[in-house]
Amino acid sequence: MTVRRLESKSEHISDDEERKEQLDYKKQMDVDTDRNIVLNGRLESQIAKLSVPPHEMRVVDDYSNSKNAERHSGEIQAYAKFAGSTWTYYVKKIRIILGREPANPSPKGKNEDLEVIDMNFGPSKVVSRKHAVVEYDLDDQTWNCSVYGRNGIKVDGKLFKNGETVKLTSGSILEVAGLQMMFVLPNAAEQKQTDESTIKEDAIKSEISAAVNDAAEYGDNKKPPYSYSVMIAQAILSSSECMMTLSNIYSWISTHYPYYRTTKSGWQNSIRHNLSLNKAFRKVPRKSGEQGKGMKWSIVPEFREEFIAKTRKTPRKRSPSSPVPLLAKKREGSPSLPIPILPKMKDTSIPAAEPASSTTSARDQTPSTPKDVGSPSTAETSAEEKQMETYKTPTHAALSDIISTHDYALDANSASQTKKAAFGSPIGSSTYPTSSPAPFWKYVAVPNPHDWPQVGSYDTISPYRNPVNSHLIYSQIQQSSPKKIDEQLHDLQGVDLVNGFEGISSWRESMVNKLRSSVSDSPTMNLANSNSKSSPVAVQRVSTLPQASANKQAKEMESKMSNSPTQKSKTEENNQAVRAILDASATMEKQYDLHRLPTPTSQTESASVPQIANPPNSQNLVKEKSPQQYIQVPQSNVKSSA
């Protein structure tokens, strides 16, 4: 009796299990059917929006939906279908040809070699006779489209030309000559939904598993680097249904993060508050027939990607008190875990300091002597670098030197002083003669009337203004006080480069006024007649005249100039006077270069001034210098053109 009771009881349990399985399967089928209806409705809405060209298309007329309804009744067995907005072509072969049939087909027998067109896109000649071939690949188990037409085919908006092959999937939209159609496989809605869900679930599982498995690296008393909301999302996404009760969330967190097993800091209250206050989480009712009480928690779809992205981020930096590496260890039987990306450290290493001799201060550089500041120094300095370091301003700066000459004077005695000055106190502005864009006319060596050489050495009137005496060749004698002139020119006549320069017009006027005052204050001298047949190198002897006769001649010349019909204004006279001075200075420099003789070197400062050979009969030259000596008096044997 007991055996029969046990058998009847077991049969009763087995019947109940079968009924339960049948009910579950029926419910699942109903859910899948409803889901397919929804997805098929979405596909139908997309197909209805496909474009149809205005010109005639045979495939649209031959396979319109109305004709298909007349041909077929009920379900249609086909491998796939090309669905347009008003037509549908069912694929019943594993290889079909898309093209255009000839307008006038020839009798049978002649076109036996030609392949039959399955989908006729004529009569438009935009489509080739054999435009494309769609066939099923048995090896890869995929549908492929090979293009043969000259105008190509667009698949999902991308143009594929002749000779190219594209893989077709369910939902791919093809466009031929402006006609759009969708390639749909059987149960495409279910397949598409399954593929998308599978891809998403795989991505979620991979991301969540990577984040969850990091918990194995956190032992006791090691707090995980995630916020409560992220840990809740990890727990929910780890389940197959993406739903979890509150108690299961507690157990999942305490299982994967041992820190929360021993701590009693009220983390469960924090979890509960996050679920109720965070809008990313919502309550979901249990399935019908599911055991248990209470509702489950899930993630709002809009925030799902956000939580997945947060799990990808590197955990926050640990404190120095617990320098535990965040590298995941590969365990046996578990998938390889991704290595967290460590934050990049900035290169804070200080470059090696260069020797002090490699850098050159700006005071040692001029536009004419550039240096590479950052170049590494060598033990021995080349001769060219030494010359650059001992550069000194020329003592005699003329207009020709500044414009066309680059041979600067080098003073060997001042080399050590220049090197010390580079690292000492600031140097005055006179050390920078060409360091600022100053007017170069300030550097012209205008001869001082008191320092002019003796009479007869050269002609002060420009050859252009006095063509009668243009045949004279000038020579300059040794200066009596070179030190005084050097200091005067080296200081640039009291001009400060920092504060700037005065205008050229005011400078001309001041120079002319100085010249006139010196002429009026100095004693007058007369020039003697010279022998016109003498050598051009020889200097003419001049005899002094009485004071009264000299004054008389000067007054006569002034009266002639005042009574001249070609009177000039004050500004023109000043300009002419300054121009004459500049011409005379340039001529002096030229003659100085021609008649300069080599002199023996000496240690004294006066040896730096070039020595000029004394002209013949130089002992009879008048030692007193006067501006009147530079006014050329017309000779008696020369008639004036006036």
Curated annotation (Swiss-Prot):
The entry's DNA-binding region: 223-318
An annotated GO cellular component: M/G1 phase-specific MADS box-forkhead transcription factor complex
Chain intervals with Low complexity compositional bias: 348-362
Domain FHA: 96-160
Phosphoserine, modified sites: 319, 321-322, 334, 336, 375, 535, 626
Protein name in UniProt: Fork head protein homolog 2
Subcellular localization(s) per the UniProt record: Nucleus
Post-translational modification note: Phosphorylated. Occurs periodically during mitosis.
Pfam families membership: FHA, Forkhead
General function of this protein: Required for promoter sequence element PCB-driven, M-phase-specific transcription. Acts as a transcriptional activator with a role in the regulation of mitosis. Binds, cooperatively with mcm1, the CLB cluster regulatory elements throughout the cell cycle. Regulates the periodic transcription of cdc15 and spo12. Required for the correct timing, positioning and contraction of the division septum.
Feature: compositional bias, Basic residues: 310-319
UniProt-annotated stretches for the region Disordered: 1-23, 310-392, 519-574, 586-642
Keywords for the protein's UniProt record, in alphabetical order: Activator, Cell cycle, Cell division, DNA-binding, Mitosis, Nucleus, Phosphoprotein, Septation, Transcription, Transcription regulation
One GO molecular-function entry: DNA-binding transcription repressor activity, RNA polymerase II-specific
Main location: nucleus
